Amino acid sequence: MSQEASVDGRFGVASSPTIEEAAGLLEKLLDGSSMVVVAGVCSSEYEGRGASVSTEGDKLLIVKPGGAVILHGPRGFRPLNWQPSTSHTEVATADGLLTLKFYRRTPREVLKIACGSIWYIAWVRFPEEGAFWMYMTEDDLRKAVALHPRELLGEDIRFFAEEKRTPSGKADLYGVDERGNIVIVEVKRVRADESAVRQLEGYVRDYPTQAKVRGILVAPDISDAARRLLESRGLEFRRVDLKKAYSLLKPGRGRSVLDFL
């Protein structure tokens, strides 16, 4: 078996493993933390929502973090078999075959895959799940927040500056709330992480006043670590609905795919 992996172990590939080598590697990889791709000559049996069998042939197996399983043949875009989640996985070898069994508890489903040869096994570990948005750019989101703070942030804020330069960088929005407090807003179009919190903290620290300054991080989601850091720094988080922000910013637009969601 030829095996290559990154120094930190986040991704790698094993080429032409024996059945025993493939089993040993998959027992380590199928722990729910890696995206695993297996290519080889395999057959499958499924029982659950219905029942199906695919005979031995070229197959591509994808196992995602969290247990989603997808089995593809060489043609078309529809999978031969799939399961949305897995409760338990078994890896075994017998009679020259590598056997993988993926069990789902509720509703009960079992997907069994038997491979006579493996061409390669590839894997990658994702430390943080990203997000895919098609609604708007970050500039659009910042404009929507500036124009519609009541609808998106839940309070009236009068903004008087955008992308104001500070020693820590450009702060997205500066404003004043209903009580006269200075408000600094950092906008993120994707899930906010700890670096976004530190950005906002720097902007608040840089503001030249002894009065109270509120720092608000605006994003569609926030990681647990970022939320803990945010709260420890006395900052605030507002969850924003991107679809709502888009509709507020584009009230006169023609019909788009969003109208059918």
Swiss-Prot record:
Keyword Membrane: no
Top EC class of this enzyme: hydrolase
InterPro entries: Endonuclease_NucS, NucS_C, NucS_N, NucS_N_sf, tRNA_endonuc-like_dom_sf
This enzyme's EC code(s): 3.1.-.-
GO cellular component: cytoplasm
Keyword terms: Cytoplasm, DNA-binding, Endonuclease, Hydrolase, Nuclease
Family matches, as Pfam families: NucS_C, NucS_N
Keyword Hydrolase tagged: yes
Compartments reported by the entry: Cytoplasm
One Gene Ontology MF term: DNA binding
Family according to the record: Belongs to the NucS endonuclease family.
Free-text function comment from the UniProt entry: Cleaves both 3' and 5' ssDNA extremities of branched DNA structures.
Protein name from the UniProt record: Endonuclease NucS
Gene for this chain: nucS
